[in-house]
Amino acid sequence: MNDFGIKNMDQVAPVANSFRGTLKRQPAFDTFDGSLFAVLPSLSEDQTLQEVPTGLDSVSHDSASCELPLLTPCSKAVMSQALKATFSGFQKEQRRLGIPKNPWLWSEQQVCQWLLWATNEFSLVNVNLHQFGMNGQMLCNLGKERFLELAPDFVGDILWEHLEQMIKENQEKTEDQYEENSHLNAVPHWINSNTLGFSMEQAPYGMQAPNYPKDNLLDSMCPPSATPAALGSELQMLPKSRLNTVNVNYCSISQDFPSSNVNLLNNNSGKPKDHDSPENGGDSFESSDSLLRSWNSQSSLLDVQRVPSFESFEEDCSQSLCLSKLTMSFKDYIQERSDPVEQGKPVIPAAVLAGFTGSGPIQLWQFLLELLSDKSCQSFISWTGDGWEFKLADPDEVARRWGKRKNKPKMNYEKLSRGLRYYYDKNIIHKTSGKRYVYRFVCDLQNLLGFTPEELHAILGVQPDTED
C-alpha cells in the first residue's frame, strides 16, 4: 500500500510502464501563457495605489467580455417602482407651490421649480436651468433625445422617467374621468328644471328671443369636462354660417310648435370661463354635429315640459324624432311606431329611449331602465315594488353588462357607483338611505314613460320587496 492508500496502482490506472515516473509538483500558472495577464495594469506603471479610478478608464473595450447582467423587463419594473416611490416626494412640493399635476400646464417658473426639486433630491451639480427656459408644453414636446441633450449627464434618464410618469398618471386619470362622465355628456335637462338659473319668455313664432348672458349660457351648455381648447378646436370645424346662429326649436304640450331663434354664438360672444385644469376631464367630441347634438340635449332653456328637437341640427332627421312625436310619452311613442313589445324583450329598450329623448349615446340611467324592464334580468336588478325604487341584487353583474354595452372591459361596480353619484346632484337618481345597493329614480319618469310604477310592476310581475 502506497502513501495514497491504494493497494495496486495497476488496478486503478492501467497505464503503460514506460509512462510511469515520479510525480512532480509544478505551479499551475506555468502552463499558461504570460500574455494572458498582459492586460492587467502593473504597479510599475505611472498609475499608483493612491489614484482613484474614474470608473470609465478601467472599463474594457471588449464588450463581449462584459459579465454584467442585462436589464430585464422584471428589473426595469422594479427600478420603475423604486423611482416612482422616490418621485412621490414631488407631490408634496406640488401642493406647497401650487404646481399642476399635469406637466403640460406648467409655466416656465414651475418647470424651473421642478428642476430645483430634482437638483436637491438627487444632489445634482452643474445643472444649467437656463437650458430649460420653457413652459410645460414645450418641455413635453421636446422628446426624449432632445431632452437628454439638455439634461445633465447620467441624470437625464431619471428626469425623463419622472416626467413620463407624471404625464402617464394624468392621462390615466383623465381617461377614468372621461369613462365616468361620458354617460352624463348628454343628460337631457328636461329631467332637472331651472338648470341654467334663468327662464326664457316665449317669443311669438318667428320672432327672435332676447339676448341672455352668454357666459352663463355657454358654461351651461358645455359640460365641465369640455375644455375651452377642445371647444375651440371643434368650433373651427363648423362653417362660419353655422357659427353665427344656431336655431333651436322647442315644443310645448299646451301649444302647437312655438319656435324661438336663440342666438347662441356670435362674434361678440364672451369667452367661456377658463377651467383650472383639463384634469377635470378633457373630453372631445367626435364631430361638429355631435357637439351640436350634445348642446341641443343639454340646454333646453325651458322647464320640464319643453323638449328640444333635432330639426335645426340635422336636415336628415328621421321621422321618429320629429316634433309631433316628442310631445307624447314614451309609451305612446312606441305605439305610434307600431313596435309592440316582444315576448322576453325589455319593455323599455335603452336605444329606443335614447332616440326618443334625443340624448345621443345610451346613458347609464337609460340602460338601468332597460334592465329593470327586462324580466330576464330580475335576478341581478329589479324594482322593489315601492314606486320607482330599485335594487342591485348583483351589482357586479350590472357593472359587467354596462361595461359590455359601452365596450369598457375594465368596468366594475366601483366605477358604476361613481357614475350613479353624479346623478344625485342632477336629481335623477338618489341612493336610498339605510339600504345597500338600493336606489330610486326621483325624476318625473311617469310623465316621460307614460307608465305609473304600478302599471310597470304589473307588466313585469314585480312583487313588493318584504326585506328590511
Swiss-Prot record:
GO terms for molecular function: DNA-binding transcription repressor activity, RNA polymerase II-specific; nuclear glucocorticoid receptor binding; protein domain specific binding; RNA polymerase II cis-regulatory region sequence-specific DNA binding; RNA polymerase II transcription regulatory region sequence-specific DNA binding; sequence-specific DNA binding. The modification Phosphoserine is found at S220, S225, S294, S297, S300. Residues 262-290 are annotated as: Disordered. InterPro entries: Ets1_N_flank (IPR045688), Ets_dom (IPR000418), ETS_fam (IPR046328), Pointed_dom (IPR003118), SAM/pointed_sf (IPR013761), Transform_prot_C-ets (IPR016311), Transform_prot_C-ets-2 (IPR027276), WH-like_DNA-bd_sf (IPR036388). One of its GO terms (biological process) is mesoderm development. Pfam families: Ets, Ets1_N_flank, SAM_PNT. One of its GO terms (cellular component) is cytosol. Phosphorylation by CDK10 at Ser-220 and Ser-225 creates a phosphodegron that targets ETS2 for proteasomal degradation. PANTHER family: ETS, PROTEIN C-ETS-2. Belongs to the ETS family. This is Protein C-ets-2. The gene is Ets2.
